[in-house]
Amino acid sequence: MADANDQIPSVTDRVRPVATGASVVAVKFLGETAVFALGEETLLFASPDNAEQRVAVHAGGIMAVASDGKRILTGGDDGKVVATNAKGETETLGQDARHRWIDSVALGPDGVVAWSAGKQAFVRNAKGEIKSLDLPSSVGGLAFSPKGMRVAVAHYGGVTLWFPNAQAAPDMFAWKGSHLDVMFSPDGKFLVTTMQESTLHGWRLADAKDMRMSGYSAKVRSMAWTADGKWLATSGSEQLIMWPFGSKDGPMGKQPRMLIPYDKRAVAVACHPSQEVVAVGFEDGLVMLSRLEDGAEILAKKPGAAPVSALAWNASGSKLAFGTEDGEAGIVDLG
């Protein structure tokens, strides 16, 4: 990568700073409003008219965050699962009976939500009915299938594919090791997990064929699909790593693309909602944009004092929000 400060195009003059005053755990957009989930208790709403609103959603730390663009689902160390809408109105959807931390959350179709605590996963439907599943070890992550009512539950030893509305036993996709975050590909044909080791693992769901994606210098903490589902963007190395998923075999037998080489590790990625553009945050606070077609780069945020901890695009792709571990945050207007 060229010197990020003065040799490449920059949009840093289009950044609206947001004073969070706390570590940023995640950022999501509800309409045109960027919502920053802070380390302790609070969601910070930064609306387009420059107004800011803080909403306390947990009595303690926010451990997990998900959004479908209409509401934000959070899990806290207070054992609660809370949904917050664009008006800042909150609703408690779940309360762990043993007051365990809520480790992961996910939003599904038709108002369905999922969360985990310890070795249990829970699904709540729109009627408020809750079902649970016991797992062999602590849950690492949750994801809803883009097609049908299936929930992938990552844990030590693999991923359990759960059908909460069916009587059939869950399916197990086994691979030794501790599986953390889990994602379905947008077409529902592949399942990918990050692992405790510096690697990704995946399965082709049609035949449970294993896919191993390695070569990282650190644990992969962030991954995202491009809008067309043909590429998986990942952090975990001193560049952006893009795995090809455009064929029926996915990345099997193929090499990844590597973009934005840098001397610091990528720690956060977010794909543009309609174009082949990826935002990448690095451990020194730098945020870059990369266009897959030709590898062109744009500087969105200069390096700072702490790693990037959150990135998100709005639905149209005209705005990019970022946050860091020390609370530096902003919204880049690309419209």
Language-model features: locations:
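WD40-repeat beta-propeller superdomains and closely related acidic/aromatic-rich repeat-like regions
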Residues: 1-335
